[in-house]
Amino acid sequence: MKIKKNNVIDCPILIATSDGYLDLLKPFSYLFNEFWSAKQPVTILGYKSPTFGLPSNFTFESLGEQRGIQFWAEDIKKYLCDLKDEYFIYSAEDLFLTRPVNFESLKTLLKFWHTEDFNLARIGLGNTVKNEAHTH
């Protein structure tokens, strides 16, 4: 996976949503195109299609009928298991980009993805993990 011209990467960017949060796709797509690139393809994973247009670099994939929160992870897992790509970037519609993407940091991350001894499960690119209190 490489960063191409216009800050486009050749791996899927998948953004999860649900019917109750479709309106968040408006600010999400605007901020994504502002701070990443309007040339970067993005796939929205949801249930009902939005009733408004998305930017041309965004596509919508329905996960079927929204059956409730208890089935959400199952629906996402089914989609991901059918994905042919080795790598993907996954996020949610309520995690907005709020400043330009640091592509030098992204290049460093991509190097880690390519090392044989690095088994990556998750990297949090936002502040929520470090700023929110956790109780377990």
Residue ranges and their predicted role:
Residues 29-40:
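Short, acidic, metal-binding catalytic loop of nucleotide-sugar glycosyltransferases
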Residues 91:
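Catalytic metal- and UDP-sugar-binding loop of GT-A-like glycosyltransferases, i.e.
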Residues 1-27:
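N-proximal low-complexity "stem/linker" segments adjacent to membrane-targeting elements
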Residues 95-97:
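Acidic metal-phosphate-binding loop of nucleotide-sugar-dependent transferases
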Residues 99-131:
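Conserved donor-nucleotide/metal-binding helix-loop-beta segment in metal-dependent transferases, i.e.
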Residues 44-88, 101:
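Active-site-proximal specificity loops/subdomain of glycosyltransferases
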Residues 136:
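A conserved mid-domain beta-alpha-beta active-site/ligand-binding segment of alpha/beta enzyme cores
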Residues 21-25, 48-54, 130-131:
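Short, charged/polar "capping" segments at the starts of alpha-helices
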